[in-house]
């Protein structure tokens, strides 16, 4: 399996490493990236590709690839996907698939022309043990009709400090924090509910990583705790509390789905004891879990009895790496899909990724306009492409 990459950052380096662990014949033969931040990790793992090209066109023109991995900054994804589709190459694109609504409609046009079979997406939570167990509970009707959900994704201060310094701090590059970081979660809960969001509302802003909150430092102390993740790269800066970022550092959203279910969602990027928790309440039972702490339980509504109890391991437990172990599970399924020529069904596709992205964008529109946003016209437009 011959692989090329456009954007060889730390994420794509780790994705390739996981694929290589599963399939020793997978070989990344070339990449395009003027500043390959994933190089250090790749060299340590002895997987750094030997050929570097100046452009994607040049690489696609000179190499016969079985897979193109797209790990470039979000606003570049559309251009790189288009070139991959036109070259008839199978694509793995990191989330979010594109960076704004205009790009979403352009991608829809591309998919209408070229088909969606050649695009695989990195919405990794769908591959997690939590997702697999929840799908089983739902298919067995243990939870009944999903009534309401509450969920959160919080990250540690050092991770928030990374967002304040990395290119992701600029909405023009990333599409915003809700899109960049939380489209995973929005997709996951749409999967659980089995319905599209129809109305969204949101509040949020930047109140933690601001100059007035710079910690008072004792002698010998410094702000390095906020720079623990120091793999920065393109367009990065050093400032954390005085960052020129235009993204939020906290946000809440409310979502109503077409089938009547509701979700309240909360994200904050300065949480020292981070968690990624959810409670799913149905007509017959409830499930609650935490990706970070690793647990998933379910209870019967009528009897109160626990009907499911599993601990998949803490995210900080030794050996539990890569999105709570889901990276390895994702790459195993994708490898099977590639080897079996798309006969292996995957739990998520490019249309799911587009929908999650659109919801994130509308959540931010609500935050910026101080209005509840109805999504019906948006879904009508997407459906008109018959994807």
Tell me the role of every PLM-derived stretch.
Residues 62, 66-67, 73-74, 78-126, ...:
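Beta-strand-loop-alpha-helix segment that lines the small-molecule cofactor/substrate pocket
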Residues 30, 67, 148:
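Short, Asp-centered acidic motifs that coordinate Mg2+ and/or phosphate
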Residues 204-205, 211-217, 224-329:
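NAD(P)-dinucleotide binding in Rossmann-like oxidoreductases
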Residues 1-47:
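N-terminal Rossmann-like dinucleotide-binding module
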Residues 67-69, 258, 293, 303, ...:
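C-terminal helix-rich "cap/oligomerization" subdomain common to oxidoreductases
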Residues 34-37, 318-332, 348-355:
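Active-site loop of classical SDR/Rossmann-like NAD(P)-dependent oxidoreductases
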Residues 50-55:
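Conserved SAM-binding strand-loop segment of SAM-dependent methyltransferases
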Residues 12, 117, 125-241, 370:
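Predominantly a Rossmann-like dinucleotide-binding segment in NAD(P)-dependent oxidoreductases
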